[in-house]
Amino acid sequence: MKKLISRRNFLKVCALAGSAAALSACGGGKSTGSNNSAAAAVDVTGAVTFPLSEKVTFTGMTSFPVGSEPEPNNRTIFKRLEEQTNVHIDWTAIQSDQWSDKITLNMSNPNTLTDFVFTADFTDSNLLRYADQGVILNLEDYIDNNMPYLQKVFEKYPEYRTMCTDSDGHIWALPWIEQLGAEKTAIQTIGNMSFINTKWLNFLGLSMPTTVDEFEQVLMAFRDNAASIKAEYGIDGDIIPMSCIVNNGDQDPSILINGFGEGYGDADKDRHIAVTNDRKVICAATQQGYRDGLDWLHKLYAEKLIDPECFTQEWSTYVSKGKAGRYGVCFSWDVANIDNLTDWEPLPALTADTRNITPQNGSFTSGFARGRCVVTAKATNPALVCAWLDQMYAPLQSPQNNWGTYGDAEGFNIFELSTNDKGEPMLKHAPLGDASPVEVREAQCVSGPLAVLDDYYGVYVTCPDDAQYRLDWIKEIYTPDMNNDYVYPNVFMSNEDTEQVSNLQADLQTYMNTQKADWIMNGTTDAEWNEYLSKLEAYGLSDYLGIMQKYLDAYYA
C-alpha cells in the first residue's frame, strides 16, 4: 500500500530541506499565492458557487507554445475565467521547449512550487514519484465532493475514472479528454497519416496506388519527371518524391509497412508493441513483416525516392520544404500543416503480403492524458483549488481551453458565440481560411485539464472542420482495413512496474529506433537481424512484454 504523506509532513520536509525561507514558500511566512487569508478562509464542503464574494489568489504553473503569448493572464480565456470566478492566478509560465527541464527543477524546489501545475503532462512514473514524496495530493475525494463537472464525466464514462486510478485506488492528477469518434473511427487511431500529391498524380496521368509496388512506381515517376513538374508548377528547389522524419511521431513513415508479414506494422513508435486478436502482447519491431518493410523502405531510399534529410531534419525545415510545394508524399497528422488541402489526399492502406491498418495503442478510448494537471501540497485550500479547476470541465469551457475562444479583438478567433437548436449558447467554429490550424489554436488555447465529449458536438460546440474531414478520412479510407480487434489500452501500473517498464523501455526504444533508421539508410543482413533480436532479449524484451501482458489481462479480466 502506498504511503500517503500529509501536507503537514510535506511542510516538515520543506523546513528540513531549505530553512525558514523554504518553510515560508511551502506554507507559512509571507502571504503570497493561495496563502492569503481570503483563500484559506473559504469553507469548502461541497460544490462551490462562483464568482466568490471575495477575490482569492492561487499560484499555478503552465507552459506556452514557442512564439505565442507568454503571459497567461493576457490570454482572453484566463481573463474571462478571472471575471467569472473572482479567482486570480499568479502564473509561472514556461516556454514549451524548456518545460521538461524546468518543471523537474520547479517541482523539487519549495521556493518555485505552485498550488497546481496546469499543464503538467506527467508520466505515470512522475506521478507516483511525486506522490511518494508527498509533493502532490491524491484527488479522489475532491473530485467526488468539489468537482461536479468532472464527476459527471466520470459517471458517464467510468472507464476514464478507472484509467485515472492507480493500483491503490488513488487519483493523482486531473485528465485531459478529447473525444472525436470512438473505437475504430476515433481520430486518434492514426497519427502519422500518409498523404499523396494528387496534383502531381493527375499531371502525370497516374492513378492512386493501392499496393507497395504501385506506390514505388509512382515515386519513380515523380523522380523521373521532376523537371516537368518543376516547370509546370514553378517550384523552386529539388523535387522530393517522398519526405518524412524517421522516428518522429506523426512524421514517421511506418504506416507504409503495415501490409508486410502478418500486418502489424509499427503503429506504436515509442513502445513498438501490438496486440494480437487473441489478446497477446507482441513486439511489432521483432516481426518478420517489420524487417521486410524496412528492407523495402531501404530500397526506396537507395533509389533516391526518399528525402535524404529524413533522419535529421527539424519540423521547421520539413514544413518549409512542404510549403514550397516540393513533396510528392509526406506524413503528418494533417497535411494542412505541411502544404494545403486542395492538392493532397490520404494514401490508402498499401497491400504487400496483406492489407491492414493497425490503430494506435490507446486510441479506442479517444484522446486521453492521465497526468495533465496536479494539485500540490503547497495549496492551503486544495478543495477550493480543485473547485476552480473543475470549471475547466464545464461543457462550454473545455472546448475553448482545448482549441481557442471568441471575442478576442486583438487576434484571430477560433469560435463565434452562437446558439444551438434550442437557443442555448454554443461555440461555432469560425472559418480558418488559409491559416494553419496549429498556429491559430496555439495563439488562443490554454490546454490544461478538460473534457470534450462526442455528445457536446451540436449542443455546446461544433466539430472543428479539420477534425471532421480527418474523421471522414479515417472512417472512409482506413477503418475498413483495420482488422485488429484490440489496441493496448491506457493502463495505470504500480510504482514498481512503472519503474521497471521505464528502465527497460529506455534501452529498448533507443536501440530499436537506432536500428530502424540505420536499416532504412543502409539495409540489413540476416546476421545483423539475428544480432538485433539477441540484443533486444538481453535488454529485457521478454520481461517488458510480460509486464505489459499482465496489465492487458487485468484490463480485460
PLM segments and residue spans:
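Helix-loop-helix "hinge/cap" segment bordering the ligand-binding cleft or interdomain interface
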Residues: E140, D168-Q251, V275-K321, V375-D408, ...
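Extracytoplasmic/periplasmic substrate-binding proteins
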Residues: V56, T62-N73, L180-F195, N202-M208, ...
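Conserved small-residue motifs centered on glycine
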Residues: A387, A394-Q515, G523
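Catalytic-domain carbohydrate-binding cleft regions of carbohydrate-active enzymes
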Residues: F78, T104-L105, N111-V117, E216, ...
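General small-molecule cofactor/ligand-binding pocket signal
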Residues: H88-I94, E309, E345-L347
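Conserved N-terminal structural module of periplasmic/extracytoplasmic solute-binding proteins
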Residues: K2-S6, L11-E214, A226, G265-I273, ...
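Carboxylate/His-rich catalytic cores and anion/metal-binding grooves
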Residues: N138-E159, L219-F222, G237-D266, V329-D339
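Glycine-rich, aromatic-lined ligand/substrate-binding cores of catalytic
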Residues: K299-Y301, Y318-W333, T342, T351-Q444
